[in-house]
């Protein structure tokens, strides 16, 4: 465990307390990792890949000297750079940090297990995968992608009805009384782990009776199947759609208050690793954590032992399409983040999560108020510069370039700032000076 003292924030989150029905898979995983060193645990969203990985770490922790956990954010090179080593110097560049971290990870032997959670890309999309696969430690990836060229363990539904019924009874106290109906509900949602959990929580909250829920799911399933007869499952897409439709039905049975819908809408931008509930409540100016706690009870909002909250990936996708977060709708969140970024002298210890959230906003938000959005980006950039957060700075430059291409968008000062930002990241002094001169020329037009 020496490594955990050296790399902060890299311990494996604990699996949920009610982890059941996967004994065979745990053993298979152990054998595969022993024989192949690197294993990709694949399966559709909500089937329990991340939970199995966490349970594996807990179950076999005596077999390893170190177990490290990294949540994939879309770029392996960046995720390794962003690991928190205790002797990282604040003034070191991203490149230096990356080289030190990579060198250290390369030195680890097979008594270390590295878990890379939510690696949802193809091998060609993340060119750095081939480098990571040269590490000598054991690596367990969880992924929704089909990566057939590697050693994979496909995770299917839990077949044992008793185990699934047990899971439902953890969340639904009257499951025994309505056993027959609950089992039918489990069959109707195709034994999909996350759907079973949501259904049980829905019943526990008294929002509908087991019979009502079963009828509703069956009706939805029948209409879905009629539309879907033509599409024979070619790529697993249609089965994925079926699961989404179940989750969607369960989601729509809740009548969420406007405040709760708003919270969910803003939570779409949180990094998948989650953020402290208190910090998030402060960003949204919520007087209490009550609404968030109610959402945790429904199962839509996930929480870990560290009191961090995030949306389940399936719920995030549904929330995005249902609530359509926009600059106007999420103005309180944007104002709060902008406010933090304007306090240049003030350091926040969660800056990485803050910047990941800003990155997700750029990617997902509807830009329905361009002047406000431009100001938001222009205030975020210098704050990222304080922390040498180049990934985010590049993201802002790309977004500004894209927006300011259109003549009617933005002002001369917006264009001057973009040139100034590009100069900040330019490594060649003569190029940087030229960019600054161009920026000044833009401003002369104004004065």
Identify the residue ranges that each predicted region occupies.
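Alpha-helical sensor/transducer elements of the RecA-like P-loop NTPase core
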Residues: 1, 51, 82-83, 134-198, ...
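Loop-to-helix "switch" segment enriched in basic
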Residues: 164, 202-260
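Charged, amphipathic alpha-helical interface modules that flank catalytic cores or transmembrane segments
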Residues: 1-28, 32, 54-55, 211-222
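A eukaryote-biased feature capturing mid-to-C-terminal, repeat/solenoid-rich segments of large proteins
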Residues: 206-226, 259-261, 320-345, 350-354
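Conserved P-loop NTPase "ATPase switch" module shared by AAA+ and STAND
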Residues: 104-124
């Amino acid at each position: 465990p020496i490594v955990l003292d050296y790399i902060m924030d890299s311990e494996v989150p604990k699996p949920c307390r009610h982890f059941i029905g996967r004994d065979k898979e745990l053993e298979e995983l152990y054998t595969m990792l022993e024989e192949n060193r690197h294993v990709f645990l694949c399966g559709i969203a909500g089937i329990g890949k991340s939970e199995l990985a966490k349970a594996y770490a807990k179950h076999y922790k005596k077999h390893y000297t170190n177990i490290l956990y990294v949540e994939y954010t879309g770029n392996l090179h960046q995720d390794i750079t962003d690991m928190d080593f205790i002797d990282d110097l604040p003034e070191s560049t991203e490149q230096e940090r990356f080289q030190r971290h990579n060198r250290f990870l390369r030195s680890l032997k097979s008594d270390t297990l590295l878990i890379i959670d939510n690696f949802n890309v193809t091998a060609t999309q993340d060119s750095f995968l081939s480098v990571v696969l040269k590490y000598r430690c054991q690596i367990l990836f969880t992924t929704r992608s089909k990566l057939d060229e590697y050693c994979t363990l496909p995770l299917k539904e839990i077949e044992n009805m008793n185990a699934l019924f047990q899971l439902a009874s953890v969340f639904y106290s009257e499951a025994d009384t309505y056993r027959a109906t609950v089992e039918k509900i489990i069959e109707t949602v195709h034994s999909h782990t996350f759907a079973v959990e949501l259904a049980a929580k829905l019943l526990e909250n008294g929002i509908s009776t087991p019979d009502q829920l079963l009828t509703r799911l069956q009706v939805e399933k029948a209409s879905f199947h009629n539309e879907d007869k033509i599409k024979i499952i070619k790529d697993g897409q249609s089965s994925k759609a079926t699961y989404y439709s179940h989750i969607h039905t369960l989601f729509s049975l809740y009548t969420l208050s406007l405040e709760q819908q708003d919270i969910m809408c803003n939570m779409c931008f949180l990094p998948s690793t989650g953020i402290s509930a208190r910090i998030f409540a402060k960003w949204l100016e919520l007087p209490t954590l009550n609404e968030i706690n109610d959402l945790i009870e429904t199962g839509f909002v996930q929480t870990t032992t560290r009191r961090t909250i995030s949306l389940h990936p399936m719920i995030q996708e549904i929330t995005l399409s249902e609530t359509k977060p926009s600059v106007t709708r999420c103005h309180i969140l944007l104002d709060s983040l902008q406010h933090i970024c304007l306090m240049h002298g003030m350091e926040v210890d969660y800056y990485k999560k803050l910047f990941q959230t800003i990155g997700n906003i750029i990617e997902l938000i509807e830009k329905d108020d361009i002047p406000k959005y431009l100001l938001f980006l222009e205030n975020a950039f210098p704050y990222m510069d304080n922390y040498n957060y180049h990934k985010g700075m590049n993201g802002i430059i790309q977004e500004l370039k894209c927006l300011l291409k259109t003549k009617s968008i933005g002002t001369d000062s917006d264009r001057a700032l973009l040139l100034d930002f590009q100069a900040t990241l330019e490594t060649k002094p003569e190029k940087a000076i030229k960019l600054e001169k161009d920026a000044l020329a833009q401003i002369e037009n104004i004065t």
